């Protein structure tokens, strides 16, 4: 712990760490109580902020010339079931002017929405939808918060740690019916339809010329 900031092992060069620490101290002073935690690791500064302040924080990071984080990289989620606020929403930004990155995190639970940041970075639209789809994290103020990757009528959120590995239904193409069918998951081998011509499963076929490759 140095001047209120955690510097983890395998950080960047001493000069670079000093620059990031200076930026961290500046942000802590400017943003005040919005910043809950700070850390430097792997050439990046990470801030944990209050969810209610995420729009103000990202706006400052974008507009402050000393920050210049104008490139929005992505949003992702993380699930820690043992915590009271089990979810992290993680924002990654890039400053081309200063050649550095920053990671901003907020923590929330299943019922508490996180403010949408579309007004700050319009590209966050589909990333927030993806995070909602895969984790069930809600975003208040989003104009079209619906699933993005999973199918119509999908139940649950597949990247939650308590989501079953097999899922709840199996989707397959039924040769007899000539259509895609949804059925409860069955683990019996008799149920599986092996594609023996697939290079990923099935037997090893002997092809003409294979004998030449034998030692």
Curated annotation (Swiss-Prot):
Summary of the function given for this chain in its UniProt record: NDH-1 shuttles electrons from NADH, via FMN and iron-sulfur (Fe-S) centers, to quinones in the respiratory chain. The immediate electron acceptor for the enzyme in this species is believed to be ubiquinone. Couples the redox reaction to proton translocation (for every two electrons transferred, four hydrogen ions are translocated across the cytoplasmic membrane), and thus conserves the redox energy in a proton gradient.
Assembly and oligomerization: NDH-1 is composed of 14 different subunits. Subunits NuoB, C, D, E, F, and G constitute the peripheral sector of the complex.
Membrane topology: Peripheral membrane protein
Protein name from the UniProt record: NADH-quinone oxidoreductase subunit C
Record field: catalytic activity: a quinone + NADH + 5 H(+)(in) = a quinol + NAD(+) + 4 H(+)(out)
This enzyme's EC code(s): 7.1.1.-
Subcellular location as annotated: Cell inner membrane
GO molecular function terms attached to this record: NADH dehydrogenase (ubiquinone) activity; NADH:ubiquinone reductase (non-electrogenic) activity; quinone binding
Keywords linked to the UniProt accession: Cell inner membrane, Cell membrane, Membrane, NAD, Quinone, Translocase, Transport, Ubiquinone
Keyword DNA damage among UniProt keywords: no
Record gene name: nuoC
